[in-house]
From Swiss-Prot:
Residues 16-28 have a biased composition (Basic and acidic residues). PANTHER family: UPF0102 PROTEIN YRAN (PTHR34039:SF1). Pfam families: UPF0102. This is UPF0102 protein BPSL3274. It comes from the Bacteria. It comes from Burkholderia pseudomallei (strain K96243). The lineage of its organism: Bacteria, Pseudomonadati, Pseudomonadota, Betaproteobacteria, Burkholderiales. Residues 1-28 are annotated as: Disordered. InterPro entries: Restrct_endonuc-II-like (IPR011335), tRNA_endonuc-like_dom_sf (IPR011856), UPF0102_YraN-like (IPR003509). Belongs to the UPF0102 family. Signal peptide: none annotated. GO terms for molecular function: nucleic acid binding.
């Protein structure tokens, strides 16, 4: 599987949002998730990444966003949102099982597209009115 290039950690950027992050117009959990994925996509595009795919589903897993860095690196993005960090926050909610599912889906996508590019796994977390971008949040060998 692909391995990440050296990357510096991203920094959180405050973003205008309701105090608890959750858009009022979205009624369903799926609608809320889609709204956060759109916000994450726009943020990453402003940071210079290009959208490759959204909601890539393969047997055993799903990837919220697949982006591409200017240097060609594929970036598999998990978008997480929590109203508060009482139970560990958005980023902490990605356990070993979820990482394994992300890795399986990413590997299938990566192989289907030729497997030539470097890649990494990022998390965009929405917590307490802030968007936090965790670049290179985990690696393929961290899954278990």
């Amino acid at each position: 599987m692909c391995h990440a290039r050296e990357a510096s950690p991203g920094t959180g950027e405050p973003e205008a949002a309701p105090r608890d992050n959750f858009p009022r117009e979205a009624g369903s959990k799926r609608g809320i998730g889609a709204a956060f994925e759109t916000r994450a996509q726009r943020f990453l595009e402003r940071a210079g990444l290009a959208l490759v795919a959204r909601n890539v589903t393969v047997r055993g897993g799903e990837i919220d966003l697949v982006m591409r860095e200017r240097d060609g690196t594929l970036v598999f993005v998990e978008v997480r949102a929590r109203a508060n960090s009482r139970y560990g926050g958005a980023a902490a909610s990605i356990g070993a099982r979820k990482r394994m599912r992300l890795l399986l889906a990413a590997h299938a996508f990566w192989a289907r597209t030729g497997g030539a590019n470097a890649c990494r796994f990022d998390v965009v977390a929405f917590e307490g009115g802030r968007l936090v971008w965790l670049r290179d949040a985990f690696r393929a060998d961290d899954a278990g």
